[in-house]
Each structure stands twice: as C-alpha cells, then as structure tokens.
UniProtKB/Swiss-Prot annotation:
GO CC terms of this entry: extracellular region
Tissue: Nacreous layer of shell (at protein level). Expressed primarily in the mantle with highest level in the mantle pallium and lower level in the mantle edge.
Protein name: Uncharacterized shell protein 4
Keyword list, A-Z: Secreted, Signal
Region forming the signal peptide: 1-19
Species of provenance: Pinctada maxima (Silver-lipped pearl oyster)
Location in the cell: Secreted
Amino acid sequence: MKYVALAFVLSLVILQISAQGGGLTSLLLQKEYMPDSWFDYKLAQMILGGPTGRKSRTQSGRNQRKSNSDSWLWLALAN
C-alpha cells in the first residue's frame, strides 16, 4: 500500500513538472532536490539509470550544501 501511494505522489509530481515545461531530470539536477530517504534516492537512480552504489544521508547533505558548480561536478562524476 505504501508503494501505491508513493507511485501516485510521484506521478502527480511528474505531471506537475511536465506541465511547467521541465522534465524529471531537470528536477533532479536542481541543487535543492536531494531526497532525505534512501528509498527516494534509489528510486531516482532507477528512473535515471544512475550509479548503483549506496549513498549515505551524510553524503547527500554534504552535496546539498555545495555551490551550484560543485553539484554539476558531482553529477558529472556520478554518471
């Protein structure tokens, strides 16, 4: 039941982003978006086909505080 609710919320988010003219990747490339839960992070990786290694919350928080150019560098290294 939890997964059904999560899929519903995710579909609403995707519909909202596509209505604004962006894509899911543009949302994930924004510096503000760094999921708090490990499950959300893995779901985003599955959608984007990103790296399969586990990433801890502390690393996510560290990347969230970096400047925009540093986050682009991190994304380039992650892919």
